[in-house]
Amino acid sequence: MNRGRSMATPGEQCAGLRVWNQTEQEPAAYHLLSLCFVRAASSWVPPMYLWVLGPIYLLYIHRHGRCYLRMSHLFKTKMVLGLALILLYTFNVAVPLWRIHQGVPQAPELLIHPTVWLTTMSFATFLIHMERRKGVRSSGVLFGYWLLCCILPGINTVQQASAGNFRQEPLHHLATYLCLSLVVAELVLSCLVDQPPFFSEDSQPLNPCPEAEASFPSKAMFWWASGLLWRGYKKLLGPKDLWSLGRENSSEELVSQLEREWRRSCNGLPGHKGHSSVGAPETEAFLQPERSQRGPLLRAIWRVFRSTFLLGTLSLVISDAFRFAVPKLLSLFLEFMGDRNSSAWTGWLLAVLMFAAACLQTLFEQQHMYRAKVLQMRLRTAITGLVYRKVLVLSSGSRKSSAAGDVVNLVSVDIQRLAESIIYLNGLWLLFLWIFVCFVYLWQLLGPSALTAVAVFLSLLPLNFFITKKRGFHQEEQMRQKASRARLTSSMLRTVRTIKSHGWEHAFLERLLHIRGQELSALKTSTLLFSVSLVSFQVSTFLVALVVFAVHTLVAEDNAMDAEKAFVTLTVLSILNKAQAFLPFSVHCIVQARVSFDRLAAFLCLEEVDPNGMIASNSRRSSKDRISVHNGTFAWSQESPPCLHGINLTVPQGCLLAVVGPVGAGKSSLLSALLGELLKVEGSVSIEGSVAYVPQEAWVQNTSVVENVCFRQELDLPWLQKVLDACALGSDVASFPAGVHTPIGEQGMNLSGGQKQRLSLARAVYKKAAIYLLDDPLAALDAHVSQQVFKQVIGPSGLLQGTTRILVTHTLHVLPQADRILVLANGTIAEMGSYQDLLQRNGALVGLLDGARQPAGTHDAATSDDLGGFPGGGRPTCRPDRPRPTEAAPVKGRSTSEVQMEASLDDPEATGLTAEEDSVRYGRVKTTIYLSYLRAVGTPLCTYTLFLFLCQQVASFSQGYWLSLWADDPVVDGRQMHAALRGWVFGLLGCLQAIGLFASMAAVFLGGARASGLLFRSLLWDVARSPIGFFERTPVGNLLNRFSKETDTVDVDIPDKLRSLLTYAFGLLEVGLAVTMATPLAIVAILPLMVLYAGFQSLYVATSCQLRRLESARYSSVCSHMAETFQGSLVVRAFRAQASFTAQHDALMDENQRVSFPKLVADRWLATNLELLGNGLVFVAATCAVLSKAHLSAGLVGFSVSAALQVTQTLQWVVRSWTDLENSMVAVERVQDYARIPKEAPWRLPTCAAQPLWPCGGQIEFRDFGLRHRPELPLAVQGVSLKIHAGEKVGIVGRTGAGKSSLAWGLLRLQEAAEGNIWIDGVPITHVGLHTLRSRITIIPQDPVLFPGSLRMNLDLLQEHTDEGIWAALETVQLKAFVTSLPGQLQYECAGQGDDLSVGQKQLLCLARALLRKTQILILDEATASVDPGTEMQMQAALERWFTQCTVLLIAHRLRSVMDCARVLVMDEGQVAESGSPAQLLAQKGLFYRLAHESGLA
């Protein structure tokens, strides 16, 4: 009979239908595979593959096609090769037809096979053409087809040639080789990428992601990312090295899609009217939602991301199919090893199939993980953008129900939890399928004995849930202590000036360390329970196996234990164990994600600003009225009562309307109503023209001065200079280190309160708006600056003349210059008219003026512009040799400051920055950091831990080896003689492993807790001992990051990563030992694999560490921008800057994604390549076993191969654990950063020059005293020599930046003297410890400070006084009745920093605290500047009663406060300009007289 005529045509007819034909005699010993099997597979598998997937693929590219590709040389070559294959197969079809026509009988298969291949090749060529039409540059379907066409027919061709079948027909021989060559060429070409489309929709980015240019094999194994990993290995990665973000991953695209679907889902909600209208009660509305609102958000997310999720799910299902194929193949392989008569080709085939199944499982699983991680990234981006856009439209009522920290918590915690849950969603149903398949496998292997596995498995589940519940209780306790510690640490760092001024560091350190001790105690208990949980997970496979083996061997009739039963059971139980551990974890993560999802949905449903609350127009109509309110009634939210009633108001063009009234009258609410921020109950509001708004509490961004003022408008340099000079900022900016490019820090930390308010005013003025709404912008300015700003900006001749201005003010002396005055009382308009008209009416305005009880022109609520100036208090930025101008006239021509500003604009880096940026670490972590951590753990404990890990791994190895010996025991009459002994020893080894595992893990966690405690104590001590200048240069956020995030990393992450690294590393050694012991020949292949492993590890670790650090830094900027926008959303809306802020947020998110995407790709690159290496180790173990079959037992082979099967995960987790550990070790490095900074003087001196009762008199003497706030700055105080007598009351006055507060700082040694010294009662203060000095002086600052804790703790931090003494002090400051009315009285818990108390009440409590100290020296640093006149009178009365015999230094802006002082010091440019009694200084008509004249006192 004629032989086959095609590449797939059989060389001879098969004997029957069995492809595993063992009756057919093999032609030669070197034939490894059954010819019948190979012929069948090569004939039908490739065509079936393409006809199943081809139509689906064709439909997909038809729906998702892009622009067609160029007719490139690659495409032409593919088509030519395809047509050549069609011609060859046409020839193969024609030959049998011609022979039939000639009367030569032909077997049907000789015609069917070539015909099938002809149609299949035609279809493949058609797909090549359609791919070009639809823009497909690399095809996975065709790559798989050509690969199958190469492998299966290739094997058939080799066997046909080796059997000599081609010698009979040379022509067929040549045709077959030609076909195979063409297919190989097609395979090679499918590994290449075609040219980009003709008309690309997207512009080409600078550094495009190479994924688009990658071939299918490169995409499957993530080789396209190798370039970035190589760059990261060779050098430090920078922003230019990161790939540009594709449009499909950009914030603009993702957020717009989700927002569109979210609005669509919300349209169906009852009561929805185009914007969210869910009420916002005055509670944590979105933290504890009363009803679930997740439905619309869930539908929106599903519509946007379902295709990506479903494709990833399909990859996971296929991966699991191959996962369960491996145990079946292992079973067949061990059966082959146990059968000495089996053919060699069976072993080779099974080894190849195990390797192929493991590789396919790896590739599909990693594709699932890749898509899941990309989906996580996209979901996080989309929901974060949705939350940000919601922040920009939140109503005032909704904002009151939340805080910036809550929103940041949504972004950093809840969105992260929701994104992470994507991976676990499929676990809710797929794990049950795992469990079912595992039990089916066990039943096939062990029969009814497998039911015991069910019993043990079910009994372990309650144990895990119990441990999880108990651990959760201790974790909650740890979180409570951590929250308490965080609150106290934050309060301590934000009020460090007050703490150091009073010498309270020890008290706070003791409180913090006590809380820290409780936190670590809960952490230790939690980690010990975690160790038990981990041991139960690790040992559960052993427990189930022990019970199953014992029942099977001791109860069942056929109780022989062989290698197949033993090691296949262990492999299946390993899969079952993963399901057992993963299931509760998945449920826990999904439950947490559900809570977070509810919080997010509730937040997104909060009440928004009513778009119909105000009718705004930029058109200029004929009406002269810019603002019109008709019968307006407004409320903060739907639940709250109206705050404004019956408002009827019209403001014409160019009018200056002053709004006054008592506290709580509704002045700020009126401005909010005009801005559309309040809920309009009835009436109408109309505004014609653009609006600029200045809030009462200045809001500034963490950017430069020029960016704050320009506020996303084009830079107009002359106008900018004019605005800065008019707002009294010109000289300030000129003295800043980097001029207008000087960063002002987080929340304006580098500026004083007055500077921030003037910057806020400058921002509004720069806009050139038609309407200005000014909410008491003069309150934070001293009298002189207030007058200057009003005259040059707000007043009739200021920059805003001709615009419509509504000025809310408590500065009553400006009222005569207002065009109209509106007096509010209890939310209604009491009266309105000109100043003279209202005086004649003798109404509400006259009552306000009489109630002020101060001369006209006195500033009523000024706050110090001196404390906290840039960069530290005392305004060091104003140089002493530059006199501060008393009036800033409009600039003509090019002034010096304008030239300086222009120079700074040209070179923003010329003078450097002031605040210390939180640095991003680059490169590898130094060895010294690891050694410092290990020293904190303790050398003995480290050695003991390594010994325990070694012992438990020896027990694990012995357990597997003993099981192999058990499986190899001879079977006599269906039984093994020593089965009982084998079982007892197997159980004993498992118990020893469990004990060693628990002990080793507990040692790691307890050692980590010990190291964390020591490192935290060291960090706390280093920060507490730092001088005040360190806190002025270092943002509070940086410090809090060390005490929160970095400390948490040291607490939890480092011990866990170290435990993981040691576990996997020792496990990897066990696998290597098992494989080499069973087949020593494997060492030849293992060594090259280890070289590749080391190479992958080096590339990954170097790059991943850098990417993770960059990602952390980028994401923190997103959170900071979110919090900043939340705090200033009212200003953003008033300036109509929502679009630019949204664009900035999207840009920040995109920058974060530019780091996140390479990071997740690098993770997949590592996992794929290391798992493929692990699969290679399995293949090596199996092939070596086949080669050494003659002298290897099945039990030893099972031990070796089953151990190798577990190494695929172990390889990548060793590297990941090492990388995670290195990333976490950065926290140790950052925690130790502050150990090297200079420390302040000792708190206590062993030989102190002061007596126990020092100072007994209170005499203070300055001798040539000079002080500078930073080494590079000029002297803020210089050449001060004066003596203050005991018991003398001295006032200290001067303009802003004159050095008033600097004298107090020098007296308390908050800043050390640059020259000279200060003596108190004849003792130099440098000879006294800081705490000794500061505890003997009392200072009452301008800003009252309270701390989290009870009222009693706030009054007596050192616990030195009795309750009776505290009540007496409270009675003196007239707060006894108030405190008595509080719940708990002295034990009343203050919220935050006394947020539930008024400013006046907090200041009186600070005064009571000062009374309890009973020191001889008292410093009042503008202590009454921010309180109302009534509170000021109370404070003055208490001071006169308690401090009559004390030396009092009264620092004041308001000269009225120092008129009763015995002596007044007038500071000017850091020197004492004048000194004498108030009457003498007024008579001299010098600087004091000019200040008094400006304040209306002379």
Curated annotation (Swiss-Prot):
<dbReference type="GO" id="GO:0015431">
    <property type="term" value="F:ABC-type glutathione S-conjugate transporter activity"/>
</dbReference>
<feature type="topological domain" description="Cytoplasmic">
    <location>
        <begin position="59"/>
        <end position="78"/>
    </location>
</feature>
<dbReference type="GO" id="GO:0016887">
    <property type="term" value="F:ATP hydrolysis activity"/>
</dbReference>
<keyword id="KW-1003">Cell membrane</keyword>
<dbReference type="GO" id="GO:0140928">
    <property type="term" value="P:inhibition of non-skeletal tissue mineralization"/>
</dbReference>
<dbReference type="InterPro" id="IPR003439">
    <property type="entry name" value="ABC_transporter-like_ATP-bd"/>
</dbReference>
<feature type="transmembrane region" description="Helical; Name=11">
    <location>
        <begin position="575"/>
        <end position="595"/>
    </location>
</feature>
<dbReference type="GO" id="GO:0046034">
    <property type="term" value="P:ATP metabolic process"/>
</dbReference>
<feature type="topological domain" description="Cytoplasmic">
    <location>
        <begin position="1014"/>
        <end position="1056"/>
    </location>
</feature>
<dbReference type="GO" id="GO:0030504">
    <property type="term" value="F:inorganic diphosphate transmembrane transporter activity"/>
</dbReference>
<feature type="topological domain" description="Extracellular">
    <location>
        <begin position="1192"/>
        <end position="1193"/>
    </location>
</feature>
<feature type="topological domain" description="Extracellular">
    <location>
        <begin position="553"/>
        <end position="574"/>
    </location>
</feature>
<feature type="topological domain" description="Extracellular">
    <location>
        <position position="1078"/>
    </location>
</feature>
<dbReference type="GO" id="GO:0030505">
    <property type="term" value="P:inorganic diphosphate transport"/>
</dbReference>
<dbReference type="GO" id="GO:0055074">
    <property type="term" value="P:calcium ion homeostasis"/>
</dbReference>
<feature type="domain" description="ABC transmembrane type-1 2">
    <location>
        <begin position="942"/>
        <end position="1223"/>
    </location>
</feature>
<keyword id="KW-1278">Translocase</keyword>
<dbReference type="GO" id="GO:0016328">
    <property type="term" value="C:lateral plasma membrane"/>
</dbReference>
<dbReference type="GO" id="GO:0016324">
    <property type="term" value="C:apical plasma membrane"/>
</dbReference>
<feature type="transmembrane region" description="Helical; Name=5">
    <location>
        <begin position="174"/>
        <end position="194"/>
    </location>
</feature>
<dbReference type="InterPro" id="IPR003593">
    <property type="entry name" value="AAA+_ATPase"/>
</dbReference>
<feature type="binding site">
    <location>
        <begin position="1294"/>
        <end position="1301"/>
    </location>
    <ligand>
        <name>ATP 2</name>
    </ligand>
</feature>
<feature type="domain" description="ABC transporter 1">
    <location>
        <begin position="627"/>
        <end position="851"/>
    </location>
</feature>
<dbReference type="Pfam" id="PF00664">
    <property type="entry name" value="ABC_membrane"/>
</dbReference>
<feature type="transmembrane region" description="Helical; Name=3">
    <location>
        <begin position="105"/>
        <end position="125"/>
    </location>
</feature>
<feature type="transmembrane region" description="Helical; Name=7">
    <location>
        <begin position="348"/>
        <end position="368"/>
    </location>
</feature>
<comment type="function">
    <text>Mediates the release of nucleoside triphosphates, predominantly ATP, into the circulation, where it is rapidly converted into AMP and the mineralization inhibitor inorganic pyrophosphate (PPi) by the ecto-enzyme ectonucleotide pyrophosphatase phosphodiesterase 1 (ENPP1), therefore playing a role in PPi homeostasis.</text>
</comment>
<feature type="topological domain" description="Extracellular">
    <location>
        <begin position="1"/>
        <end position="37"/>
    </location>
</feature>
<dbReference type="GO" id="GO:0071716">
    <property type="term" value="P:leukotriene transport"/>
</dbReference>
<keyword id="KW-0472">Membrane</keyword>
<feature type="transmembrane region" description="Helical; Name=13">
    <location>
        <begin position="993"/>
        <end position="1013"/>
    </location>
</feature>
<feature type="transmembrane region" description="Helical; Name=15">
    <location>
        <begin position="1079"/>
        <end position="1099"/>
    </location>
</feature>
<feature type="transmembrane region" description="Helical; Name=8">
    <location>
        <begin position="425"/>
        <end position="445"/>
    </location>
</feature>
<feature type="domain" description="ABC transmembrane type-1 1">
    <location>
        <begin position="309"/>
        <end position="592"/>
    </location>
</feature>
<feature type="topological domain" description="Cytoplasmic">
    <location>
        <begin position="126"/>
        <end position="137"/>
    </location>
</feature>
<feature type="transmembrane region" description="Helical; Name=16">
    <location>
        <begin position="1171"/>
        <end position="1191"/>
    </location>
</feature>
<feature type="topological domain" description="Cytoplasmic">
    <location>
        <begin position="369"/>
        <end position="424"/>
    </location>
</feature>
<dbReference type="GO" id="GO:0005654">
    <property type="term" value="C:nucleoplasm"/>
</dbReference>
<dbReference type="GO" id="GO:0008559">
    <property type="term" value="F:ABC-type xenobiotic transporter activity"/>
</dbReference>
<dbReference type="InterPro" id="IPR011527">
    <property type="entry name" value="ABC1_TM_dom"/>
</dbReference>
<dbReference type="Pfam" id="PF24357">
    <property type="entry name" value="TMD0_ABC"/>
</dbReference>
<dbReference type="GO" id="GO:0005524">
    <property type="term" value="F:ATP binding"/>
</dbReference>
